[in-house]
Amino acid sequence: MSKKAVPPIVKAQYELYNRKLNRAIKVSGSQKKLDASFVGFSESSNPETGKPHADMSMSAKVKRVNTWLKNFDREYWENQFASKPIPRPAKQVLKGSSSKSQQRDEGEVVFTRKDSQKSVRTVSYWVCTPEKSMKPLKYKEDENVVEVTFNDLAAQKAGDKLVSILLEINVVGGAVDDKGRVAVLEKDAAVTVDYLLGSPYEAINLVSGLNKINFRSMTDVVDSIPSLLNERKVCVFQNDDSSSFYIRKWANFLQEVSAVLPVGTGKSSTIVLT
């Protein structure tokens, strides 16, 4: 009976853990040479008490080695795995909108009166590619991670603001439950399983059927897709070669359109059509 092959994602997780473990052991040895009283890292037991760790699961071992590297090899941790702070720009307000206005449902058109005759309305619209059907996600030979680009999603007019990006991935077939991941990597990171699993940003597990992953900025709107992603890149990892991935990309924009409001005074009301 042939030995069951180890899934690529499990293999990559062990390789990443072993890389961290080897680093912790190496640094521990170097520190002990400088200070004999230094308490180094131990995978199997608590070095301070000498007692075996109660939890030897992979998640517990990863948590322990991560904590140790953060405390005793901070520079290495920050260079390899730490999350960089995300800038938080001031909240943007669309032209003609009021800072006191409340958040409204998607697709609603809001009229904001600037004076007695002129106003601007903001219209929400979506663009997608491909338009008619989803397309297969293609990987290079002997690779199972690919970067997804969004430069084919264009606004109708220059100056339209971007609200969000939606990535649809339909997973068909496959022999294992763990289908793959969607993760955000730094701009200069290599597009590999190792970097994807070690990304400091949240990774989304994919399941059979249709998966929808939304990407939004910390501000209400941004000027471009690179601004929304903070110059980072989106990558998809396919864990099971027997499954097929099909994708479609969407972008939600806001467009300002000139409008004319009735002149005069009196009671003003709004009806929102949903």
Swiss-Prot record:
Keywords: Capsid protein, Virion. Its main location: virion. The keyword Transmembrane helix does not apply. Residues 88-112 are annotated as: Disordered. InterPro entries: RBDV_coat (IPR009516). It holds the Pfam family RBDV_coat. Transmembrane segments: none annotated. Residues 102-112 have a biased composition (Basic and acidic residues). It is found in: Virion. GO terms for cellular component: viral capsid. This is Coat protein. The lineage of its organism: Viruses, Riboviria, Orthornavirae, Kitrinoviricota, Alsuviricetes.
